[in-house]
Amino acid sequence: MNIKDIGVIIAKKPLKENTFIITVFTKNHGLYSGVAKESSKKSKFIYQEGNVVDFLWQARLHEHIGIAKCELVKSYIGHFIINKAKLYAFNSVISLIKELFHEREEHYNFFSLLINYLDNLAKNFCFHDYINFELALLAEMGYELDFTKCGVSNTTQDLAYLSPKSGRAVSYEVGAPYKDKLLPLPKFLLSGNDKITLEEKRQALNLTSYFFNRYLFHNHRQPEIRQVFVEYILEKDAITA
């Protein structure tokens, strides 16, 4: 059987000389892995993580790992390797997809979101965009957080916390007596302001980390590569603050 699709290479593991197992996040079929061979200098450039490729997967049976062939559509790596924030953000989002999506599980809408994020990241690193990506990933996995109104009073004013149980915003008035049991809600997520303080960045990363760890990673740790990104962003801002 054959599968043709467009996708982003998210993993590449050596199998033997010039042969690798690649994993591609495809637009219409989710994650697919296959054996790919680098037969020339050109193909070595094609099979890089983050490359957008025309993907052909061939196997006798669907359950087989199959043979993968790719043609390059777009490469981002040149934009990322010259900037640590871009590179670490890129590595983090790829590692999260690799960990959370299951092989051959369809995620139709998320592919275009990933491409849009990578296009924007190639131009400029934006922390707000990164957090929005993590929030979208949580929503894709069934854990959409709601910042639109207080989950108790329905007010849209003075939202200050997030309930760790419901994933819904809580107003300052309602939440103040229970603030030790609630998550602080970063103001930039409500205002859209890209002038984000170090404390707001810490709050935002703690917020998404909480839901990743509680509902998705459970007893195993989040990807180490994401932690590298988190530490870099917070340490970099602490030094320049």
Curated annotation (Swiss-Prot):
Protein name in UniProt: DNA repair protein RecO
Annotated Gene Ontology cellular component terms: bacterial nucleoid
Record keywords, A-Z: DNA damage, DNA recombination, DNA repair
Gene transcribed to yield this protein: recO
Keyword DNA damage: yes
UniProt function note: Involved in DNA repair and RecF pathway recombination.
Species in which this protein is naturally found: Rickettsia bellii (strain OSU 85-389)
Bilayer-crossing regions: none
GO biological process: DNA recombination; double-strand break repair
